[in-house]
Amino acid sequence: MAKQYDVLFRLLLIGDSGVGKTCLLCRFTDNEFHSSHISTIGVDFKMKTIDVDGIKVRIQIWDTAGQERYQTITKQYYRRAQGIFLVYDISSERSYQHIMKWVSDVDEYAPEGVQKILIGNKADEEQKRQVGREQGQQLAKEYGMDFYETSACTNLNIKESFTRLTELVLQAHRKELDGLRTRASNELALAELEEDEGKPEGPANSSKTCWC
């Protein structure tokens, strides 16, 4: 039976409550959009497998609550993330200003070298815009991040942004990936991961790897 994926890692969505993190996640994983807003309680996640340069990448995407009362819980997930989306709402100057606080949290709690992308979400709400595209680009430049304006409503830059962060994580781990390729000959890697889905651990010869 063909293996389901070659490598697995975690991505994290962080940002203020109401910026559309859950909508981004649902659009990317399920191609669904729900206009009604229900705040995430604590942490939720979804899975998706994509192909990047011939590598089957299994992504575990964590959606964190933005409310202050959940911060102690959500910060625990920073430590095991390989990639992080910092999300603000283009119609909320406040959420944009708070990105500095979220960056500070990443610097404190996430592993060194974690890959980051800045997202200006709800780009479909142009008539409500409070944050210019140039502001987002400038902030991303200051922090050394790629930048995308997205819309879960219209599906703008959803696949592109998730694929880009996946590429950045793969590039950051290219040395490990090449080493695993060498040791495993024609197979990509050898490692096991319980995917937080309640699945039992697989046999020792499964050809998968995880940077978690």
Curated annotation (Swiss-Prot):
User: Does the UniProt entry include the keyword Membrane?
Assistant: yes
UniProt entry keywords in alphabetical sequence: Cell membrane, GTP-binding, Hydrolase, Lipoprotein, Magnesium, Membrane, Metal-binding, Methylation, Nucleotide-binding, Prenylation, Protein transport, Transport
| Description of how activity is regulated | Regulated by guanine nucleotide exchange factors (GEFs) which promote the exchange of bound GDP for free GTP. Regulated by GTPase activating proteins (GAPs) which increase the GTP hydrolysis activity. Inhibited by GDP dissociation inhibitors (GDIs).
Q: How does it sit in the membrane?
A: Lipid-anchor
Q: Where is this motif: Switch 1?
A: 31-45
The gene name reads Rab15
Q: Where is the lipid attached (S-geranylgeranyl cysteine)?
A: 210, 212
> Can you tell me which family this protein belongs to?
Belongs to the small GTPase superfamily. Rab family.
Cited SUPFAM superfamilies? P-loop containing nucleoside triphosphate hydrolases (SSF52540)
Q: CDD domains given for it?
A: Rab15
Q: What is this protein called?
A: Ras-related protein Rab-15
